């Protein structure tokens, strides 16, 4: 169905994809929002299934998602605006408008996880157990959300030749043709990597019972893919000459490796 819309909804006369799915009572409903909402809904169903696997009440998982999600969205926008502050020229309306994109996933994860940690401590719940359940849902939502970037014509790489882009399906070629130039579809690489990570996490949650391994597995795997893909993008948030996402990804990989190593050593000691 989505592929059908990819061919139907084009900007009139331009041949490029239209980021607006439809208009409702004068309000433009964009694919970016639809895909994020779809990811959230699928994530909720996935969390319900995984809560049964880990024998945790779904109500607790749902509560933490409903609290962390809006805070995560606020954090994602705040993070993005901080690093792009000069481009807004003090325009507050543009700063809070997320309909055209501009959500930095690292900001969303930091703020969302912080909210989840505070809530779990308040309710005396295991933060790591809850995040193990949430991790597959988060990466699944990210995988779908990248297609929202596709419709917005963002999160792509640098210019490429037609001989490069012609290897991709026609609708990808169309979406990555911007102002007469072909661009590297890095959104597709990240979406694919996220789906692969989702599958790995679903296997982990069934096989590994150690608290936190699924969540930190998510942190490490996502960071690994993001580090390399970020190097190809043209719209990176920058801190001087450094790509912020690559810096955060390195930290994510180190933290993930440290936790999983610690968990493995601890399990070995207990089993002796």
UniProtKB/Swiss-Prot annotation:
Keyword terms, alphabetized: Cell membrane, Membrane, Transferase, Transmembrane, Transmembrane helix
Transmembrane segments: 25-45, 64-84, 100-120, 185-205, 212-232, 244-264
Domain of life, source organism: Bacteria
Any single Gene Ontology cellular-component annotation: plasma membrane
Pathway listed: Protein modification; lipoprotein biosynthesis (diacylglyceryl transfer)
Entries under PROSITE patterns matching the protein: LGT
Pfam families: LGT
Coiled coil segments of this chain: none
EC number(s) stated in the UniProt entry for this protein: 2.5.1.145
GO molecular function: phosphatidylglycerol-prolipoprotein diacylglyceryl transferase activity
Record-listed a 1,2-diacyl-sn-glycero-3-phospho-(1'-sn-glycerol) binding positions: 146
Subcellular compartments: Cell membrane
Membrane topology (UniProt): Multi-pass membrane protein
BP terms from Gene Ontology: lipoprotein biosynthetic process
Family: Belongs to the Lgt family.
Function summary: Catalyzes the transfer of the diacylglyceryl group from phosphatidylglycerol to the sulfhydryl group of the N-terminal cysteine of a prolipoprotein, the first step in the formation of mature lipoproteins.
HAMAP family, A to Z: Lgt
NCBIfam families (alphabetical): lgt
Full protein name: Phosphatidylglycerol--prolipoprotein diacylglyceryl transferase
Protein species of origin: Clostridium acetobutylicum (strain ATCC 824 / DSM 792 / JCM 1419 / IAM 19013 / LMG 5710 / NBRC 13948 / NRRL B-527 / VKM B-1787 / 2291 / W)
Lineage of producing organism: Bacteria, Bacillati, Bacillota, Clostridia, Eubacteriales
